[in-house]
Amino acid sequence: MAAIQGIEGVISQLQATAMAASGQETHSQSTVSFAGQLHAALDRISDRQTAARVQAEKFTLGEPGIALNDVMADMQKASVSMQMGIQVRNKLVAAYQEVMSMQV
């Protein structure tokens, strides 16, 4: 669900940019900052990893209602979200380096 909200935020920003480029007025003035979105994404990654770790601990302690397949699925989701975060960081660093190497 959080990933869908993040994607919707990116799509709305792209639509607003496209409308601004074509000279149209945007109907919804969203004041979402890039830093805020990045911070929220990092918080979601951290929350997902924490939840997976807690569920793994509960499974290890033998709490009823915790299935191995649920633990493995949550661990995999946490791993994929971490890898996605790393790739986003790599792209941001590459874009920053490219901008810094431009001649003015």
Swiss-Prot record:
Family affiliation: Belongs to the FliE family.
Name of the protein in question: Flagellar hook-basal body complex protein FliE
Record carries keyword Repeat: no
Gene: fliE
Species lineage: Bacteria, Pseudomonadati, Pseudomonadota, Gammaproteobacteria, Enterobacterales
Pfam families reported for this sequence: FliE
Subcellular location as annotated: Bacterial flagellum basal body
Main subcellular location: other
Recorded GO CC terms: bacterial-type flagellum basal body
Alphabetized UniProt keyword annotations: Bacterial flagellum
InterPro entries on file: FliE (IPR001624)
GO biological process: bacterial-type flagellum-dependent cell motility
PANTHER family: FLAGELLAR HOOK-BASAL BODY COMPLEX PROTEIN FLIE, PTHR34653
UniProt GO MF annotations: cytoskeletal motor activity; structural molecule activity
Domain of life: Bacteria
